[in-house]
Amino acid sequence: LVESFMLLDSMKNKKVLLITGDMLSHKVSRRDRASRPITGDGVAISVIENSLNTGDIYASIKNNGKAAFSVYIPAGGSKIPITEETGIEREDEFGNWRNLQQLCMQGDLVFNFIINDTPVMIEELMTEAKEIKENVDYFICHQSSVFTLKKLREHLGVSKEKLPNDIVPIYGNSSSATIPVTLTHHFSDMFKDKNINRIMFAAFGTGLSLGAVLMDVPKFDYCEFIEYAHSNAQL
C-alpha cells in the first residue's frame, strides 16, 4: 500500500493495481495443530488512485530481524535447498507434524512481538500525525487470530466495534490479504452513515515486520467478495 502511494506521487493521473494474498493452506502441514486450524487462502485486488477528498497519509514501517525465525519456511532457499529429506514430516515437542518445506511458527514469540511492538508503533504514528485515538473511526489490523486481536485491542484501549477480530473464524488467516478482507467484510456497516472514514491500518508478521498507515478512506464504488471452490489437493 505504501509503495502504491509512492508510485502515485510520481504518476498523478494514473492508477495502481495492488494485488496481495497467499495460499497458506498449501504451506501449512495438515498435521500442524497449532497453525492449520486458523489457516485461510485469499487474494485481494485493489485499485489505488489519488483523491482530492482526503487528507494527508501517514505511514510507518519497521523490522526486527533478530526474531526472523519466529515465522518462516526453513527449506527452499540456497541455504537449505529442497531435497527428498526436507519433505519428510517430523513431530515437534508439542505434537505438531511438519516438514522443512512447510511453515514453522513460534506462536509465543510472535504474540509477544505483536502485543508489545504494535501499540508503540501506532502511538508513535498518531503522535506524528497529531491525532488521537478518539478521532480514528476504525483500527483495521492483520487478522492473525481472534485471541491476538482481542489482546491488542485491550492494549490499545479501543472498542470491539473499532477494532474487529471476527475474520479468522470465517475466512481464516490469509496472510497479507486479511486487511482488505476485513475491510470488505465490514464495508457496508462502516460506510452506512459516512462517506469517509479515518482508518488506522496495522500489519505484522514475517520478518518480523510491522507496518501502519493512518489515512482517510472514502466510500468505494465497488467492494465485493468473489468466492472460489477450495481445492483439497495437498501440495
Which residues make up each language-model segment?
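Claisen-condensing/thiolase-fold acyl-transfer catalytic domains that form or cleave C-C bonds
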Residues: 1-9, 115, 119, 137-235
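Flexible, glycine-rich active-site loops centered on histidine and acidic residues
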Residues: 5, 9-43
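Condensing-enzyme catalytic core mediating Claisen C-C bond formation in acyl metabolism
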Residues: 32-112, 116, 120, 216-235
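Structural motif
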Residues: 14-17, 44-46, 55, 198-199
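Internal helical hairpin/lid segments
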Residues: 106-110, 119-147
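Acidic-glycine-rich active-site phosphate/pyrophosphate-binding loop
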Residues: 18-24, 89-95, 148-161
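Acidic, glycine-rich active-site loops and adjacent beta-strand->loop/helix elements
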Residues: 20-26, 62-64, 170, 203-208
